[in-house]
């Protein structure tokens, strides 16, 4: 590892950006800043526990250095933070707080793409006192969803309109040209988040003034359908708490507020089979999981029978026939393979299911992903009810320039540079929901193909028959 002193050499005219975490979305972030590094006098220090990954992202560029960093090594971490002009944390969300406390200590502004945790929010007063900007939730979801929604909401309100409905959906999916399995899905981000999605409490939202709740075991059978021009029909299941941003968005009196996750039609019904069987459970460990075959794993959730096969028992439990597309989807995953081993010690059902799915759903070299976002706004203005649909589709450009990496990394990078240049200057722990923040960032994102298309029509209200 390069010595600490060598990496902390600075020149007075360079502005130093410390980037902690060299994960999937950091490459796009680094690319953006390196292209700006000459005109903006930027020097990047990419720090990660995997020095090889950090070096790869640095591209041997004269304005980028890579270092190995153990985030739990306080002396090392603080030394890097102390010398930075601004800090970007691309770490898993649970580790941001240690970096944030260092930033308070040494007077550094900070940017993350993660949700604001209670611990992060508790630093708001200290950040304001020190005139520091702690920008969070500036990836894609959360991030671009906030900015694009607030842009339309503020525009409607500026005209005197009253917001009646707001629905927002985002999905990380496989690009159409690589959509080649029966599930119409491949992992484009953290597989664990997909397997455990919806757990931890009932989904909560408002429809036509009524609070609605969907428990986990019903979540994937209560879906909304939506169409995106040029990309066909999608479905969406409810996020856990659609009401989290009601006050933040200024929607306390809204009649319908619903946020969800997008998939291709048919995914949720098929995924519900795993939920009903218990395969997505992450609360207990399967005995002797290391030596189980995939077939053993499936059989462990089925009743004992001295005569019936696992396949027959599965179809009976799920009430599906052999010629049902749901059955074909299960068979496609090679779930009943008696020779493939789980090879995971003390694994939960969710972890085992994740491994099985990764065999089939991992993006291969050359395959591309896609981010789809859909907002629906219902409002009343001058006695007329209208609706705006706003959609965004971003396609990946390969393994290092995935759609997910672009839509996470670019807004983080743009925000960091604007903070560094004083264009974003309101201190405190915050998210990008004010016009001085979202307007210039959304405008610049259009240069990278991340743009929203709007259509306006008469608003007919939410269908009361579905309540």
Predicted regions and their residues:
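Hydrophobic/small residue at the entry helix of a nucleotide-binding pocket
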Residues: 25-29
């Amino acid at each position: 590892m390069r010595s600490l002193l060598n990496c902390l050499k600075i020149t007075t005219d360079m502005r130093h950006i410390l980037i902690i975490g060299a994960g999937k979305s950091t490459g796009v972030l680094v690319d953006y800043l390196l292209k700006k590094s000459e005109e903006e006098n930027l020097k990047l220090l990419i720090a990660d526990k995997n020095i090889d990954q950090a070096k790869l992202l640095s591209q041997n560029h004269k304005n980028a250095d890579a270092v190995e960093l153990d985030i739990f090594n306080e002396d090392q971490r603080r030394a890097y933070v102390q010398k930075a002009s601004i800090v970007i944390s691309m770490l898993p969300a649970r580790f941001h707080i240690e970096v944030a406390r260092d930033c308070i200590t040494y007077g550094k502004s900070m940017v993350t793409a993660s949700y604001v945790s209670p611990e992060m929010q508790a630093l708001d007063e200290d950040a304001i006192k020190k005139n520091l900007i702690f920008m969070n939730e500036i990836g894609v979801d959360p991030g671009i969803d906030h900015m694009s929604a607030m842009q339309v909401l503020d525009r409607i309100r500026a005209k005197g309109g009253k917001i009646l409905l707001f629905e927002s959906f985002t999905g990380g999916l496989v690009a159409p040209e690589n959509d080649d399995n029966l599930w119409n899905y491949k992992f484009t981000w953290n597989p664990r988040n997909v397997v455990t999605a919806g757990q931890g409490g009932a989904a909560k939202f408002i429809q036509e003034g009524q609070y609605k709740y969907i428990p986990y075991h019903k979540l994937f059978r209560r879906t909304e359908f939506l169409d995106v021009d040029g990309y066909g029909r999608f479905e969406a299941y409810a996020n856990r708490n659609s009401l989290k941003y009601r006050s933040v968005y200024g929607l306390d009196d809204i009649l319908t507020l619903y946020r969800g996750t997008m998939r291709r039609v048919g995914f949720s019904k098929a995924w519900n089979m795993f939920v009903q069987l218990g395969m997505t459970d992450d609360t207990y460990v399967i005995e002797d999981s290391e030596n189980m075959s995939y077939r053993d794993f499936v059989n462990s959730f089925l009743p004992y029978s001295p005569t019936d096969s696992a396949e027959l028992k599965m179809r009976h439990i799920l009430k599906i026939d052999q010629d049902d597309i749901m059955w074909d989807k299960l068979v496609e995953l090679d779930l009943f393979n008696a020779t493939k081993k789980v090879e995971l010690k003390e694994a939960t059902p969710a972890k085992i299911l994740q491994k099985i799915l990764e065999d089939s759903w991992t993006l291969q070299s050359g395959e591309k992903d896609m981010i789809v976002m859909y907002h629906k706004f219902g409002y009343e203005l001058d006695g007329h009810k209208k609706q705006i649909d706003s959609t965004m589709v971003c396609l990946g450009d390969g393994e290092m320039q995935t759609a997910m990496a672009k839509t996470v990394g670019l807004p983080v990078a743009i925000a960091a540079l604007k903070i560094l240049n004083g264009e974003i200057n309101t201190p405190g722990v915050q998210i990008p929901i004010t016009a001085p923040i979202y307007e210039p960032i959304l405008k610049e994102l259009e240069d990278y193909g991340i743009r929203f298309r709007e259509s306006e029509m008469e608003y007919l209200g939410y269908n009361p028959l579905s309540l």
